[in-house]
């Protein structure tokens, strides 16, 4: 049995090797990733995922070869990105990118490599999170859910924070998130939100002004956006 320390050490070596080989993937697609007994032992029978965002164009330039190399390295699952709502295809966020892949082609290449698409990061292009725009967000998630169901994903994740200036904004965003969760749930897909750091900014109630507190040690006024999300979103959706 591989102990935890040995497993983490071997995975670290594998990760460093993967980073170093990114350029090799594009410049020399026939070169194989060196396999070691340590890596095989560390990953045998375990699931190990990769965000394809970390490879970007390097992977898109030769998907079949790149996916096969990931499988040989011990990866089993992928979290993809680059969903385009206008075409329903997948690419990356580089405006110069001209490579876009249809969902059925993406799935075939992943299946052929013996991998699985477990999750996807995607964000609506519409940035005005208002009550009036809720139907538009519903349409985005309905179309995206249909396409991602074809890929067999178990989770869809929004990784970006909409603009939130006050508590009312956070409540509207939370409701849009709830509706998105209801839509994906009908297809057997979990909906999630990937927070960063801006969610830990405090916001006031609409119309409320910040107080000038002479005590520098006094806690700032307002509620964390993250706290408002937790309070106003439904974990069952």
Model-derived regions: residue spans:
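Extracytoplasmic/secreted envelope proteins and their assembly/folding machinery
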Residues: 67, 170, 174-177, 223-227
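Hydrophobic h-region of N-terminal signal peptides that target proteins for export
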Residues: 17-21
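Alpha-helix termination/capping residues and helix-transition junctions
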Residues: 72, 114, 150, 232-235
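Structural motif corresponding to the early beta-alpha repeats
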Residues: 76-190
